[in-house]
């Protein structure tokens, strides 16, 4: 990052890093505004655009959590997967998972990739390549690698990898009044209501995200 940040911009960048470290995902504009005492999310948006111009982050238009911390300027977009100084943890990359309409997941490991363990809130067990845009507003986009920790249980509101029969999907878990729903983060998609008769299981929880392609 070649351009020096203002004190306020550094505060926002630190907040983004802390939120990603704690939750695995960046904060929303409203969360930034609340944490730093801005009057509205628009003030946070102005600072985020300045950070993007200075090369500290990348922004995804239309996504409430569409904030990406950038790798060093001299690194290629995929460097966080292959750079020898960062590749300290080797994870299997499992077949593509639909983050739109659920599709049959590939069970074989496509390859193994080395990643920086500091990218994640917990140590993941594998990476899943996302296809589709149903989790767009959580900042999870087509082609992203979702870091997943195997888990049979999850807290309400966590982003999970869930299996319905032989199909796998990435959604936000919601339990309410004894009912389980898998919620998208895109108004173009409908929630999935899990019936008592469905063959349902949690495959894991999301603990981080890696982008392998630059934002446009």
From Swiss-Prot:
Q: Name one GO biological process term.
A: DNA replication
Residue ranges of the annotated DNA-binding region, renumbered to this chain:
29-49
Q: Does the keyword Transferase apply?
A: no
Q: What EC number(s) does its UniProt record assign? A: 3.4.21.88
| Site positions per UniProt: Cleavage | 99-100
State the CDD domains in the record.
Answer: S24_LexA-like (cd06529)
UniProt keywords, alphabetically = Autocatalytic cleavage, DNA damage, DNA repair, DNA replication, DNA-binding, Hydrolase, Repressor, SOS response, Transcription, Transcription regulation
Known catalysed reaction(s)? Hydrolysis of Ala-|-Gly bond in repressor LexA
The organism's place on the tree of life at top rank? Bacteria
Task: Recall the GO molecular function terms of this protein's record.
Answer: DNA binding; serine-type endopeptidase activity
| Any Pfam family hit | Peptidase_S24
**Self-association or partners: how does it assemble?**
Homodimer.
Family label = Belongs to the peptidase S24 family.
Q: What does this protein do?
A: Represses a number of genes involved in the response to DNA damage (SOS response), including recA and lexA. In the presence of single-stranded DNA, RecA interacts with LexA causing an autocatalytic cleavage which disrupts the DNA-binding part of LexA, leading to derepression of the SOS regulon and eventually DNA repair.
Q: What is this protein called?
A: LexA repressor
């Amino acid at each position: 990052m070649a351009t020096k940040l203002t004190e306020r911009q550094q505060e926002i960048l630190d907040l983004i890093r802390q939120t990603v470290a704690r939750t695995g995902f960046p904060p929303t504009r409203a969360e930034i505004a609340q944490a730093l005492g801005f009057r509205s999310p628009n003030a946070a948006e102005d600072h985020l655009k300045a950070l993007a111009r200075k090369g500290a982050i990348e922004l995804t238009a239309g996504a409430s959590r569409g904030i990406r911390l950038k790798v060093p300027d001299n690194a290629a977009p995929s460097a966080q997967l292959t750079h020898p100084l960062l590749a300290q943890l080797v994870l299997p990359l499992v077949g593509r998972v639909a983050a739109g309409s659920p599709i049959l997941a590939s069970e074989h490991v496509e390859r193994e990739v080395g990643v920086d363990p500091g990218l994640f809130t917990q140590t993941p067990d594998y990476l899943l390549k996302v296809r589709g845009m149903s989790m767009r507003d959580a900042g999870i986009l087509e082609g992203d690698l979702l870091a997943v920790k195997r888990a049979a249980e999850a807290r309400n509101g966590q982003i999970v990898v869930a299996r319905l029969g032989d199909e796998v999907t990435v959604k936000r878990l919601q339990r309410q009044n004894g009912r389980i729903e898998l919620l998208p983060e895109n108004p173009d998609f409908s929630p999935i209501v899990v019936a008592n008769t469905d063959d349902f299981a949690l495959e894991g929880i999301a603990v981080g995200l890696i982008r392998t392609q630059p934002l446009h």
